[in-house]
Amino acid sequence: MIRKIEKKEIRNRIHRRIRRKLSGTAERPRLAVFRSVAHIYAQVIDDAQGQTLVSASSVDKDGKSKGGNVAAAKAIGKLVAERAKEKGIKSVVFDRGGYQYHGRVKALADAAREAGLEF
């Protein structure tokens, strides 16, 4: 029988394919995005060390009242960029996490760019 491939499994395949080609370094870490139904999360990761350098999410006390919509994604993008700049990070590699570059993911990326991150 042919089994139906679930959306989550397809996204994970795409994400693995992206991650094969994409890696963050200390000079240019990876800005990873995770999108759930209710919230959005962003992390700046140094893959060489295996460490999260900066993170922000709509669950944080700074972004809690925003929810998981496009406005929240913009706020989280701005917040993660500000936190990264405080740590001296100016340039990142964007990892969309297998999601389409549209809607909340695009809003987060645009807000991070406007706040001063380069990618």
UniProtKB/Swiss-Prot annotation:
Gene Ontology process terms (BP): translation
CDD domains: Ribosomal_L18_L5e
Lineage: superkingdom: Bacteria
Keyword Ribosomal protein attached: yes
UniProt keywords, alphabetically: Ribonucleoprotein, Ribosomal protein, RNA-binding, rRNA-binding
Gene3D superfamilies from the UniProt entry: 3.30.420.100
A GO cellular-component term linked to this record: cytosolic large ribosomal subunit
GO molecular function: 5S rRNA binding; structural constituent of ribosome
Presence of keyword Ribonucleoprotein: yes
Stored SUPFAM superfamilies: Translational machinery components
Subunit structure: Part of the 50S ribosomal subunit; part of the 5S rRNA/L5/L18/L25 subcomplex. Contacts the 5S and 23S rRNAs.
PANTHER family: 39S RIBOSOMAL PROTEIN L18, MITOCHONDRIAL, LARGE RIBOSOMAL SUBUNIT PROTEIN UL18M
Job description of the protein: This is one of the proteins that bind and probably mediate the attachment of the 5S RNA into the large ribosomal subunit, where it forms part of the central protuberance.
Family as reported in the entry's similarity comment: Belongs to the universal ribosomal protein uL18 family.
Protein name according to UniProt: Large ribosomal subunit protein uL18
Upper taxonomic lineage: Bacteria, Pseudomonadati, Acidobacteriota, Terriglobia, Bryobacterales
